[in-house]
Amino acid sequence: GCLNLENKINDSLSPVPEFRLEIQENTIVLTVYEGRYKPYLYKGKAYKRNDSSTVEVDRLEYNRLILEGCNQTFEEITSFNQQLTFAKLETEFIRVMGIEKINKDILKTLELYSDQSGFNNAAALLADDNQFTGIDIIRFGDTIDEIMDRESLENISILSQLEKTLQMFRKYYQYEKIEGAERKCIDKIPEKAFREAIANALIHRMWDIPASIKVSMYADRIEISSPGGLPAGISEEEYLNGQISILRNPIIGNVFFRLKYIEKFGTGIMRINHAYRNALIKPSYQCFSNSIKVILPVIRENYDLNEA
């Protein structure tokens, strides 16, 4: 029985995974260990568990398995466009780091360029022009049928996307209040929370999905939906507790960290919640298989965030 089963595994699977067969009384116990050489094919096809059934993986998932087997991420793949410019990235590094200009050595240090492969996808995402989708922002009126404003940001640096999204936020969720001789800027939604949510969407989303980050602006809230569910190995509870130790796009995350767009890896949820620490109504989070949604509510009008 064991020999027959072993032969079937060797004949049907490629590459053959590491496994162990044990006989326990009248039962054969088969233990299969996670392999490093993904994807593992059964009669030339890759499969996955989907609830209680087994289904063939689609082309996108198959490509991800190949990358995983090569110990490579999407952002590390060589960019098909090697004629990249970095004016926005250079401006930000001059502002924050005080450098004179960006050169190849700096790009190598940031892991955006190598002599062997040239620029990678992370570099393309940070470049002034690229082929990627970005952020779709809609400001709704009283109903979802009433669109007051819309901006689709794509094919530009994700640094520019963050900046332009913040400009739209300030247009609708900040106002000035005159107190005596002073003008005070009041946030309807904490800007720190919104900035953190957008920065996290950009560095944690799945970039191999041709879909935009959706920013839906309502009178009482903002909803931010980013493509891609939780990284493998992270539970929803760990995510909600701010325990994201697995960074889906570490190269981009490192650039955002150096530019002080984020303070520390994996602390986004905690920082969003901290911005609402004195508010009565709190942010909420929804995790789906292919997306994550962050909902930032407008705080009550007489609550002053600047005093929090």
List where the protein language model places each region.
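Structural motif
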Residues: 27, 221-223, 291
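A residue-level signal for conserved active-site and pocket-lining positions in enzyme catalytic cores
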Residues: 30, 125, 294
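Active-site helix-to-loop segments that bind/position phosphate- or nucleotide-bearing substrates
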Residues: 37, 51-211, 217-233, 237-246, ...
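Short, charged/polar, Gly/Pro-enriched secondary-structure boundary elements
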Residues: 35-41, 230-232, 300-305
